[in-house]
């Protein structure tokens, strides 16, 4: 049993894998036709996402230049700016890394970059997920407790800073668990095949299972639940107010009618949650399946595997289209 191995046995096992496993023809991954298609699509989405997110940032910059010099970005535009930066970070790190890694198949960049890029990859995945949570929370508070939000002008900045901070902290373990392994060729040389993996970083199998579940929860389950709850609260509040006074949609004690901008941002947050769910669900379904059944790799065809993973790259492409349509 894997979970009964002692640390000494585990270390010896890792040592043998790191130096003496012979390479046999057909036992190592290669760049297949479906892999080449994945690489092509990945770099195409990379160009689209870079153009879309950069264009939105430039549009925000032009918008601020037309306003008074000392006038700050509105609360919503500040949130969208940081979400765009997070999406751009994910685009510039995750997509090229995935594309190049699929081309080279093995890892040539050394131990240090193995750890650093693994950290940056997860950091750039946490950031946009947490920023969408911040936007959902902010919009929910703006609709359900508008007076409290107006009286606390620093709340949005605090949540933005917290999102970036948590992203950097939660990605920290990547610096420890990722490392290089070297498989030996027939002559005993360890230059045969190198890979950047988490192999033998966890003393027990359930440690890795727990870490994977924690990452999955923070990247997908918890953000999705928060977005759903926030949108449900917004819809419930608007519906209740509408039933109280069909002619005047008033929020709590406010004398002003609900501006169209708030209804527009409600639609935008719903669109965010929908895009997040559609783009990331196939990716995580495949990942969870693999956690419980590692042999599924041999049963799921290569094209299906690549197709599911490509879905995740659509999210940073869709987000700028969504907030570009609803906000500017």
Swiss-Prot record:
Matching entries from PANTHER family are given as: GONADOTROPIN-RELEASING HORMONE RECEPTOR, NEUROPEPTIDE RECEPTOR-RELATED G-PROTEIN COUPLED RECEPTOR
Q: What is the lineage of its organism?
A: Eukaryota, Metazoa, Chordata, Craniata, Vertebrata
Q: Which residues lie on this side of the membrane: Cytoplasmic?
A: 59-77, 138-164, 233-281, 327-328
What name is this protein filed under? Gonadotropin-releasing hormone receptor
Cellular location(s): Cell membrane
For molecular function, the Gene Ontology terms on record are: G protein-coupled receptor activity; peptide binding; protein-hormone receptor activity
The UniProt similarity line reads:
Belongs to the G-protein coupled receptor 1 family.
Q: Which GO terms describe its cellular component?
A: plasma membrane
What are the alphabetically sorted keywords of the record? Answer: Cell membrane, Disulfide bond, G-protein coupled receptor, Glycoprotein, Membrane, Receptor, Transducer, Transmembrane, Transmembrane helix
